[in-house]
Regions:
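Hydrophobic anchor residue at the start of the ABC signature
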Residues: 25
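Conserved ABC ATPase "signature" region
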Residues: 1-7
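A short, proline-enriched helix->beta-strand linker immediately N-terminal to the Walker B motif
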Residues: 30-34
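Conserved catalytic loops of ABC-family nucleotide-binding domains
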Residues: 56-70
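Catalytic Walker B motif of ABC-type/P-loop ATPase nucleotide-binding domains
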Residues: 36-39
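Conserved beta-strand-loop-alpha-helix hinge in the C-terminal portion
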Residues: 91-115
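Conserved ABC ATPase signature
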Residues: 11-15, 19-21
Length: 120
């Protein structure tokens, strides 16, 4: 799923940042955790790999009831979540929940980010 099988036998200096990140995600999931803490899980990934990771997180949440707490600055990655807390200056600025459409949720995220960025 994460495309890391071909990395078997490679040394750490032989893998890219994205390959290392996908390997770290696999390592975090190997023991079937009930909670997953993800700090910028798509930060070093291309858009295709980011989509694979976020769809995997959605799948394990739905099928295995794995709660994922994720920190991200990526609105597209955030749109895969069911609930988002926006933090500004160490305090909760806003909170939104996903309805039926991820695309609509993405637009809501962008709207909040526009407001958040305008409060200087």
């Amino acid at each position: 799923i994460l495309g890391i099988k071909d990395l078997l036998g490679k040394r750490t200096f032989e893998v890219s940042g994205g390959q290392a990140q996908r390997t770290a995600i696999a390592r975090a999931l190997i023991n079937n955790p009930s909670i997953l803490l993800a700090d910028e899980p798509t930060g070093n990934l291309d858009s295709k790999s980011s989509k694979v990771v976020m769809e995997l997180f959605q799948k394990i949440n739905k099928e295995n009831k794995v709660t994922t707490m994720m920190v991200t600055h990526d609105p597209l990655a955030a749109s895969y979540c069911s609930r988002i807390l926006f933090i500004k200056d160490g305090s909760i600025y806003n909170e939104i929940y996903k309805g039926s459409s991820r695309e609509q949720f993405y637009q809501e995220i962008m709207d909040v980010l526009t407001l958040l960025g305008g409060d200087n």
